[in-house]
Amino acid sequence: MLLINRHKIYRQFFILILTSIISAQDFNIARIQYSGGGDWYADPSSLPNLIDFISDKTNIKIENSEYKIKLTSESLYGHTFLYLTGHGNIRFSDEEIGALRNHLLKGAFLHADDNYGMH
């Protein structure tokens, strides 16, 4: 008698469907611009390198350009992968904190790179 692990089958099916959905959509990365502390523009080669890696190693269709976005911009919600970097103490206004929190709660992803100094 063949025993089938339903959970394993469901998990594999979910991964297959999720991969198909992600690879069918255009994907981009947006660098967060901020004015409080730090330097949001640090390490300018980091995102092009990440974009090249994703493009070379996966089937994800990623846009070959870096977007720069302010947390208070309406266009924030068009970007689901956010990138934050800088040196020093980064500070956000209450409005920026609220916007970032809401966006993350709606499913966005934040990649924070300490760039050797974020606290």
Sequence positions of predicted segments:
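Low-complexity, compositionally biased segments
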Residues: 8-10, 116-117
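Aromatic-Pro/Gly-enriched surface loop or interdomain linker
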Residues: 24-81, 85-88
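Short alpha-beta junction capping motif
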Residues: 29, 81-119
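Sec-dependent N-terminal signal peptides
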Residues: 10-21
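N-terminal secretory signal peptides that target proteins for export/translocation
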Residues: 1-9
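Acidic/proline-rich low-complexity IDRs
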Residues: 1-2, 15-17, 46
